[in-house]
Amino acid sequence: MVCIIVAGWFWKNDEQPAVEAEKPGQEMIMTQNGSRTRSLLADGTTVWLNAGSKLFYENDFNGATREVRLEGEAFFDVVKQTNRPFIVHTSGIDIRVLGTAFNVKSYPEDKNVETTLYRGRVQVLRHEDSISKAIQLIPNQKLILPKQAANEPLKLSDENKPSSKEISASFIIAHIDSTKKESERFETAWLYSRLEFRGDNFEELAKKLERWYNVTIFFADEKVKSLNFNGSFERETVEQAFKYLQAAIPFNYKIENNEISVSSSQ
């Protein structure tokens, strides 16, 4: 595993207007790959969307509950309304809050759904579960749920136990380092224009690079997919990023327009 750390800046801070979604009465906020955006919902809640994300919600937003559906990654700073819970629906879980700040990551191509709580409290439950079965998170906790386990009862996994079928079908609650500033934390690095990766194999990292730089990455052979990287990028162009990766671990690549072909150096 190789560590790469590069300083700089890369961010689009656009106020993204909502557009009409395919479903009648529903609106959508969308970010393309290579950009991030901030939006203000009708209730005063602020949402930051990471690259390649979509947020759907009812256009009146005046019901008994405030419900949104997320595909991708977003940070929510929810305005407290005691009698109107704010609910985020993802592909695997629902997150129910009153007023709080938290991050949710649920890209369709990712293996896990993750939510990290920074302020307040949240309840996490499967779509069909009642509130009585919800998992409570407190600040500085992160819940990680494999998507393959989304239809199974939520049960806490012990990270120190050997891998097993039962554990793989469970969620994990991890504690994040509360001594670090929010700008220094792994889970919210993207809010501060920093792409961080920890122990990612090249195939996993490629998905993040595709979203960050708006490129398409192809692997010419399977061998190179297993290379592991650890580090961060900010201001670097995609060309510079690949040069740093190549300097850490030898491999070949070719960039043509927005397409990148990667192959083994051996």
Functional labels for PLM-detected ranges:
Residues 1-5:
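Core hydrophobic alpha-helical transmembrane segments of single-pass membrane proteins
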